[in-house]
Every structure is written in structure tokens, then in C-alpha cells.
């Protein structure tokens, strides 16, 4: 499987590290905004080509599939371009920053029949897989998910502390993880409410947000998001269930009493991003729909679109 990766930033390298562990995968092309960065990352991971324009990679006959780790605002347009070029595509979360764009990607996926997968990593983290397996087996049901997504990002920096060329978003990026995961674990979302704090004068985004969700099963989700939190960074999920409580921190899982849970045997790796990439490659090879295909995550973007309308009305 011959791969091109666009967006050689902090998250792009996480994908490249995961892809190294998958048999038969070759990194052919690295595309990034800066030519020097693209060339440097290409050399590090053994890619024969680097450049600054996605169209260069899409024109290559030796590229089977593309992974997009580019700025949020480019995701939908680039995913469609990949499929128009006959390439399978995995687009990092979020699929789009509008409901209309998400629908457009879905339509193109249906037209082409190509694998179009979205990077909803929480579906693949061993911690969340552990809970999902118990739900599917009928061993527990979620009563409430309590989720905190906290960062300290008053300046436009990426995960490496480097300046970003684009602006992150609590609703369309960070909330997308939890909205999709809640539906994946507890059923279709039938009610959603949101409020947000003041808009940052320079970044032009809300720095604090609160979201409430309810699923068709009656489960509820309380999600707090902030770019103002000066403390432990990341997203932490508390699963309050009818048969126990668990806290998931990325790939790790503990009980509600902070007792470690062994999730090392849940899947072939403890790395959620690697597992996500393994699913992408396997779906292409096996000619099947992947977990977190655009079709399977689309409803998340319907909910985000509805929440955006609510927030706009609030002013």
C-alpha cells in the first residue's frame, strides 16, 4: 500500500510513526506548506517525493491512498480532490467545519466507491474499545459520560508549541471527538444544547464551551471544553455506567477509583492512531467499509451543525 501524507506537522508525524509498524506500507510522498519541512520529514520516513501542493501527490501513479493532516478548513475540499483523483483517503478529524461540506464529502464517497475514512481516533483507543466491547456484549450500559477537553491555547500554537498557520476550533474539532464517541457508545443523539464564552479578540473563536447531549437510549453526556485551562492538558472521559465507572485518558483506562485496567490485549497495539491507520489500510485491502467511514461518522456533523446554529442565535 503506497501512501501520501499531506500536513507534516505534529499530528502528521504521529501517523507516520504508526504507519511504520504496518506490513507492506510504503510512504511515497510528503506534502506540507513549507518545502523544507516536507523534505525533512520525507527524508526521515524514507519517502521518495516531497512538495508543497497536494496535486503533485494526487498526480502520481505510485500513490494508492492519501492521509490528510492539513488545517481543518481544507479537509472537505481536499478529501473530495483525493477521491476525484481516484485515491482512497483518510482525513483527520474533523471531516469538515460545516454540515454542508460534510454532506458534500459523503456524496463524493458514494459516487466513487472509494474508501473515505475520518480520523475519529477515540473509536480506536484501546480504552474506549474496552468499553465498547462490554456494551456490545450486553455487560453494561452508559448512564452518563462526563468529558473534559482542556488546553491552554491563548496563542495560535500546535501540539509542539510551534506557530500555527490556521486557527483551531472547540466545536468543529475538539467537540467532534466526544459527539461521535458518545453516539458510538450510547446510540443516536436526539437532543443537543450548547453555550459558549466570549469570542477571543485575536483568535476570533470562543475559548470556553459547554455541551449537553442525550441519546436515544436515554444516556446523557456533559462536555466541558476550554482553551484557558492551565493544568493537565487533553481530554478525559468518565463513563458512568449501570455496572461500574471508568475513566479513559487516551489509550489508558482506570476504574472510577483510579485502579488501572489492563487494556494491552484489546487490540494488536496500544496506540490508537496506529490502530486507526491499520483499519484504513485493512479496509482498502479487503474492499470493505472502515469503522469511522464518512457514512458512519456523518451524524456527528449533523449535531455539530445544529449546535453551531444554536450558538449563532445566542450571539
UniProtKB/Swiss-Prot annotation:
| pH profile | Optimum pH is 8.
GO terms (molecular function) for this protein are: 4-carboxy-2-hydroxymuconate semialdehyde hemiacetal dehydrogenase activity; nucleotide binding
Query: Could you mention a single GO BP entry for this protein?
Result: lignin catabolic process
Q: How does activity depend on temperature?
A: Optimum temperature is 25 degrees Celsius.
Taxonomically, the superkingdom here is Bacteria
Pfam families, per the entry: GFO_IDH_MocA (PF01408), OxRdtase_C (PF19858)
Pathway info: Secondary metabolite metabolism; lignin degradation
Q: Which UniProt keywords apply?
A: NAD, NADP, Oxidoreductase
Q: What happens when the gene is disrupted?
A: Disruption of this gene prevents growth with vanillate. Only PCA is accumulated during the incubation of vanillate with the whole cells of the ligC insertion mutant. A repression of PCA 4,5-dioxygenase (LigAB) activity is also observed.
What's its EC? 1.1.1.312
Summary of activators and inhibitors of this protein: Inhibited by p-chloromercuribenzoate (10 mM), HgCl2 (10 mM), or 5,5-dithiobis(2-nitrobenzoate) (100 mM).
Q: Which reaction does it catalyse?
A: 4-carboxy-2-hydroxymuconate semialdehyde hemiacetal + NADP(+) = 2-oxo-2H-pyran-4,6-dicarboxylate + NADPH + H(+)
Spell out the PANTHER family in the cross-references: BCDNA.GH03377
User: Per its database record, what is this protein's job?
Assistant: Involved in the degradation of protocatechuate (PCA) via the PCA 4,5-cleavage pathway. Catalyzes the oxidation of the hemiacetal form of 4-carboxy-2-hydroxymuconate-6-semialdehyde (CHMS) to produce 2-pyrone-4,6-dicarboxylate (PDC). LigC has 10-times-higher affinity to NADP than to NAD.
Q: How does it assemble?
A: Homodimer.
Family to which this protein belongs: Belongs to the Gfo/Idh/MocA family.
Protein name listed in UniProt:
4-carboxy-2-hydroxymuconate-6-semialdehyde dehydrogenase
Organism annotation = Sphingobium sp. (strain NBRC 103272 / SYK-6)
Gene giving rise to this polypeptide: ligC
Amino acid at each position: 500500500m503506497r501512501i501520501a501524507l499531506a500536513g507534516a506537522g505534529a499530528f502528521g508525524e504521529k501517523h507516520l510513526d504508526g504507519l511504520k509498524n504496518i506490513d507492506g506500507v510504503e510512504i511515497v510522498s510528503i506534502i506540507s506548506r513549507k518545502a523544507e519541512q516536507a523534505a525533512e520529514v520525507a527524508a526521515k520516513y524514507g519517502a521518495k517525493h516531497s512538495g508543497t501542493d497536494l496535486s503533485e501527490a494526487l498526480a502520481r501513479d505510485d500513490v494508492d491512498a492519501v492521509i490528510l493532516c492539513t488545517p481543518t478548513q481544507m479537509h472537505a475540499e481536499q478529501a473530495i480532490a483525493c477521491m476525484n483523483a481516484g485515491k482512497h483517503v483518510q482525513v483527520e478529524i474533523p471531516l469538515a467545519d460545516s454540515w454542508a461540506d460534510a454532506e458534500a464529502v459523503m456524496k463524493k464517497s458514494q459516487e466513487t466507491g472509494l474508501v473515505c475514512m475520518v480520523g475519529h481516533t477515540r473509536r480506536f483507543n484501546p480504552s474506549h474499545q474496552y468499553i465498547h466491547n462490554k456494551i456490545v456484549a450486553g455487560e453494561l450500559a452508559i448512564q452518563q459520560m462526563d468529558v473534559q477537553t482542556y488546553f491552554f491555547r491563548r496563542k495560535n500554537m500546535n501540539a509542539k508549541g510551534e506557530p500555527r498557520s490556521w486557527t483551531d476550533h472547540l466545536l468543529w474539532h475538539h467537540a467532534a471527538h466526544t459527539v461521535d464517541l458518545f453516539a458510538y457508545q450510547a446510540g443516536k443523539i436526539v437532543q443537543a444544547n450548547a453555550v459558549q464564552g466570549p469570542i477571543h479578540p485575536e483568535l476570533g473563536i470562543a475559548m470556553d464551551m459547554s455541551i449537553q447531549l442525550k441519546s436515544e437510549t436515554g444516556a446523557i453526556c456533559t462536555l466541558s471544553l476550554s482553551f484557558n485551562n492551565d493544568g493537565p492538558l487533553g481530554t478525559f472521559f468518565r463513563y458512568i455506567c449501570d455496572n461500574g465507572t471508568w475513566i479513559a485518558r487516551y489509550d489508558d483506562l482506570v476504574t472510577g477509583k483510579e485502579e488501572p485496567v489492563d487494556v494491552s490485549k484489546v487490540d494488536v497495539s496500544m496506540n490508537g492512531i496506529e490502530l486507526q491507520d491499520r483499519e484504513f489500510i485493512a479496509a482498502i485491502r479487503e474492499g470493505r467499509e472502515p469503522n469511522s467511514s464518512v457514512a458512519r461518522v456523518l451524524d456527528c456533523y449533523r449535531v455539530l451543525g445544529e449546535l453551531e446554529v444554536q450558538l449563532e442565535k445566542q450571539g
